[in-house]
Amino acid sequence: MKIYLVGGAVRDQLLNLPVKDRDWVVVGATPETLLQQGYQQVGKDFPVFLHPDTHEEYALARTERKSGSGYTGFTCYAAPDVTLEDDLQRRDLTINAIAYSAKGEYIDPYHGIDDIHAKLLRHVSDAFSEDPLRVLRVARFAARFAPLGFTIAPETMSLMQEMTNSGELNALTAERVWKETEKALHSQAPQVYFEILHQCGALKILFPEINALFGVPAPKKWHPEIDTGIHTMMVLAMVSRLTDDIAVRFSALCHDLGKGVTPVENWPHHHGHGPTGVPLVEALCQRYRIPNQIRDLAKLAAKYHDHLHRIERMRPSKIIRLFDAIDAWRKPERIDQLAIISEADARGRQGSENLPYPQGVFFRQAFKIANQVDVKSIVSRGLKGSAIREALTKQREVAIIEWKSRL
């Protein structure tokens, strides 16, 4: 029985990145061997065991054979005669198919170390095309490792395009698509994930609302990059510099969905694209069962992101109505979230990347001033029901008027 460190831990070790989770493969053993040594079996579909002390995952070397459609249609074979090379061959990318022995030696039959040096994401074998989830996984790895200069090997991109054209992506469940997308949104360069999906044709199948933005022009005066799809990718790149909050990042991605359904005869103008985008955001979020908290913010971002660009010119009464509309009194965190989204929208344009966004400062400060109005003093006047609401709104307007007069 031989044990090897495999997968992401070996890859990250070679990249001098922090190693988070360690996975091990066991060659030349049976389930009984590991159970006798105190390992606990956790895998139902294939033999995975938890180490009795470290609780790290140890899997028996196995092969997988395509036996059905989708990413679940595989028959697993695990036995003592499965070699390390057999096990590594079923993995997706060469950089994930390197093993590290107890003697401190790398076993690299598919030249993953060469690809790490060349900064290439390359598939191990043609069996890659048997699992449609790998299209998303490679796009996610591209996003994760883009800051290190990694790109996808041309032959792997061709294979991803073939897989997309085959219709296999339709077998992916909502949960798996969102899980990969969520991980990508946590990466340093999430826009790369969507750019890769667009490049291989998967965006049209999985995220048609986002795909529809590519090729849609916006006025050059406001958008030197012109193409709304390119602008959206720039916004996602910018918002990722401003926050790690996945709800904010996803909402920034969805802020202009309404432009994807503007009639061609109205191009390059998109009047009312904010409210138009709300049902598109709703549909996307329902399809992938995206958490309500993310969905609600994304709908608000679609509807109101343009309001913040002109917040300094708004009447105080309209500013208060905006705070009401986004439920800011009960959810004050939305102020900062929407300010960041609108800032990313303003700066996610060619030539505007380093410009300040004073509207964000104004928006935050206006809320702070309005929120300082004492509700108890209004209630103590003996007002009832809607009269309290009206008086509170008026008082908040006055507070903003007085504050603006001092600016």
UniProtKB/Swiss-Prot annotation:
Cofactor binding note: Magnesium is required for nucleotidyltransferase activity. Nickel for phosphatase activity.
HD domain span: 228-329
GO MF annotation list: ATP binding; CCA tRNA nucleotidyltransferase activity; cyclic-nucleotide phosphodiesterase activity; magnesium ion binding; phosphatase activity; tRNA binding
InterPro entries, A to Z: CCA_bact, HD/PDEase_dom, HD_domain, NT_sf, PolA_pol_head_dom, PolyA_RNA-bd, tRNA_CCA-adding_enzyme
Reactions performed catalytically: a tRNA precursor + 2 CTP + ATP = a tRNA with a 3' CCA end + 3 diphosphate; a tRNA with a 3' CCA end + 2 CTP + ATP = a tRNA with a 3' CCACCA end + 3 diphosphate
Cofactor(s) needed by this chain: Mg(2+); Ni(2+)
Xref: PROSITE patterns: HD
Alphabetized UniProt keyword annotations: ATP-binding, Hydrolase, Magnesium, Metal-binding, Multifunctional enzyme, Nickel, Nucleotide-binding, Nucleotidyltransferase, RNA repair, RNA-binding, Transferase, tRNA processing
Binding site for ATP: 8, 11, 91, 137, 140
Sites where the protein binds Mg(2+): 21, 23
EC code(s) of this entry: 2.7.7.72, 3.1.3.-, 3.1.4.-
Binding site for CTP: 8, 11, 91, 137, 140
Described purpose of this protein according to its UniProt entry: Catalyzes the addition and repair of the essential 3'-terminal CCA sequence in tRNAs without using a nucleic acid template. Adds these three nucleotides in the order of C, C, and A to the tRNA nucleotide-73, using CTP and ATP as substrates and producing inorganic pyrophosphate. tRNA 3'-terminal CCA addition is required both for tRNA processing and repair. Also involved in tRNA surveillance by mediating tandem CCA addition to generate a CCACCA at the 3' terminus of unstable tRNAs. While stable tRNAs receive only 3'-terminal CCA, unstable tRNAs are marked with CCACCA and rapidly degraded.
Matching PANTHER family: MULTIFUNCTIONAL CCA PROTEIN (PTHR47545:SF1)
Record remark: domains: Comprises two domains: an N-terminal domain containing the nucleotidyltransferase activity and a C-terminal HD domain associated with both phosphodiesterase and phosphatase activities.
Extra facts: A single active site specifically recognizes both ATP and CTP and is responsible for their addition.
Protein name per the record: Multifunctional CCA protein
